[in-house]
Amino acid sequence: HGFAEFHRYFLTELDYDGLIVDVRFNGGGHVSPLLLSKLARKRIGYSLTRWMGEGSYPDDSVAGPMITLTNEHAGSDGDIFSHSFKLMGLGKLIGRRTWGEVIGIWPRNSLVDGTLTTQPEFSFWFKDVGWGVENYGTDVDLEVNNLPKEHRKNIDTQLNKAIELIQKDVKK
């Protein structure tokens, strides 16, 4: 339900002065290209109609700067999204270096007892680091830790830092 949730809320968040995308704990999937295609739309203008009001150009484009939160629990498509967001220059990546697990599996072989086996079948290459995300992850632009003592007090240091930085970016 990740893409459906993103798409539902994305349309309500477009007109804010800044956008924070949180992919912490993203264990994978296949939605990063869909998310990135939406986030990559840079607002460059507006249309104004006589009766329906103002619209962004291009449609459904982000109004301001973006920051993505990631952490060491973002793997597979979480790694791919984080690295792509950074590589595409969509905004700052903050939190912790990602997990580094981008080898894809295909669970298609069953044993006689019904056990399903998986084997690595897909790898991922980026134009800036080649195969370098696998077994390493993606470095963040700014490392921010959520310490256990803060977590116990319901303090999200990474999110607080993202809010602080996006507010500074909006003022520029």
Q: What name fits each language-model region?
A:
Residues H1-V112, H151-I155, E164-D169:
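Cleft-lining beta-strand/loop regions that shape enzyme active-site pockets
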Residues L90-H151:
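C-terminal structured "cap/appendage" subdomains that terminate the fold
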Residues Y16, Y46, F126-K172:
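In a subset of proteins, long, contiguous C-terminal domains/tails are tracked
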